[in-house]
Amino acid sequence: MIDNVITAIDRVAAEHPTRVAYDYEGTQYTYAQLKEGSDRLAGFFAETLPEHEPIIVYGGQTFDMVEVFLGLSKSGHAYIPIDTHSPNERITQVQDVAHTPAIIEVAPLPIAVPDVQIIRAPELHEAEKTHALISSLQHAVVGDDNYYIIFTSGTTGKPKGVQISHDNLLSYVNWNISDFGLKEGVVAMSQPPYSFDLSVMDLYPTLVLGGTLKALPKEVTDNFKTLFATLPKLGLNEWVSTPSFAEIALLDPNFNQDNYPDLTHFLFCGEELVNKTAQELITRFPKATVYNTYGPTETTVAVTGMAITQDIVDQYPRLPIGFAKPDTEIFVVDEQGNQVSAGTEGELMIVGPSVSKGYLNNPEKTAKAFFNVGSQRGYRSGDLATMTEDGMIFYRGRTDFQVKLHGYRIELEDVDHNLNQVSYIKQASTVPRYNKDHKVAQLIAFAVAKPNDFESDMKLTQAVKAELGKMVMEYMIPQRIIYRDKLPLTANGKVDRKALIAEVNH
């Protein structure tokens, strides 16, 4: 149990200065380098930036990004990460909401951002080597101060900045370390971009434990041949990703325990872990434990979790997302806000110390999504779920991924789940096609098919629909199935449903 994230990382540097904190494709950086560099940057930021203002940090999957994050935290600033693979308009959209006084260029900005101080990479590199160390941590981020702000997409196209405090992060890190049994010195894959809160799942627990982050930049993950050649060389103990990324790795027949002898932990979050993916991982990695977790960005990475064992896979065609972490209460409520009985579907309400204070500079959206229960903060998740008597939770989809077709309410993720069970289908995502009156006219599925002997897509579709028809009501069967070699992913590694919706409704 730690009581401060910043001092816990500094303690590792004091006790194990030569230990490797970060490994970027073979270039290694020690905890001593992380501490000295972040201390010098903190001194520089304390002199250069207005007090306590959040600061945008633009860059990729590099050690410099982590050093800047820590330097900002030590000097009392929240950081707002923007990944280099974000569209250019993302930078201006975030700045329009955040009004930050400065942007730190770890990588060069692709566009000009007027009326804001730009701290460029040469200045950073000079400061991290020569600037005086920060004299003390008395102004460092602590308690309810914002530690980071991650922007998620908003329904109006205007992104929402989720404010995560030091205490929110502390609650998450302590739970992650204790519940998932991670050991000191853990070697963890660092694949999600820092603008995606899943990255926090590997970043801070690993550093607090004196472990090593093995960066996996997008240039590697985008090329399957390079990816499959790189992964076995990393010597991983811990794998953190979306299930979609693991499904890519599973395309490589060599992705198994023999070639990854030290891999003991799979931690999944960000989207639904399907039964057959879990089964394949359990089969291929008998010495590893597969953890399924769940949590909106607004509740700091994840608030539920459990080990997915062979018994769980056998018992539940649709896997549970686990139990609430010990310091958190989760309720399932109906549309009137009343708690429902065990097994009844409703919306998840999350109350506890890792729930955000709200959206940056957006009191209206904050008031709609957040509430107080005594001294605790609560969040309306917009996620549908059921809960058993003993508190095990099953995710059932999004309230905003519900569509009505011919009067029937359909969960798109429910259709996906069942399509993914069809023997001919490797991966599928279902989207609505709207008519000119903006009503749903059709369900269309995009699918990656397994190798098969059908003479045409039409014959394959007939077989898929016949098998699917044994699992779901007729009205849930997509009218069309479009086959692709792969489905588009967002920058965060999730299936890009919005891109598919746009494609069928252009």
Curated annotation (Swiss-Prot):
It comes from Lacticaseibacillus casei (strain BL23). Keywords: ATP-binding, Cytoplasm, Ligase, Nucleotide-binding. PANTHER family: ENZYME, PUTATIVE (JCVI)-RELATED, PTHR45398. Pathway: Cell wall biogenesis; lipoteichoic acid biosynthesis. One of its GO terms (molecular function) is D-alanine [D-alanyl carrier protein] ligase activity. Disulfide bonds: none annotated. CDD domains: DltA. It is an enzyme of class 6 (ligase). It is found in: Cytoplasm. This is D-alanine--D-alanyl carrier protein ligase. Belongs to the ATP-dependent AMP-binding enzyme family. DltA subfamily. Catalyzes the first step in the D-alanylation of lipoteichoic acid (LTA), the activation of D-alanine and its transfer onto the D-alanyl carrier protein (Dcp) DltC. In an ATP-dependent two-step reaction, forms a high energy D-alanyl-AMP intermediate, followed by transfer of the D-alanyl residue as a thiol ester to the phosphopantheinyl prosthetic group of the Dcp. D-alanylation of LTA plays an important role in modulating the properties of the cell wall in Gram-positive bacteria, influencing the net charge of the cell wall. D-alanine binds at residues 197, 301, 494. ATP binds at residues 152-153, 292-297, 383, 395-398, 494. Gene3D superfamilies: 3.30.300.30, N-terminal domain of ligase-like (3.40.50.12780). It catalyses: holo-[D-alanyl-carrier protein] + D-alanine + ATP = D-alanyl-[D-alanyl-carrier protein] + AMP + diphosphate. The gene is dltA. It comes from the Bacteria.
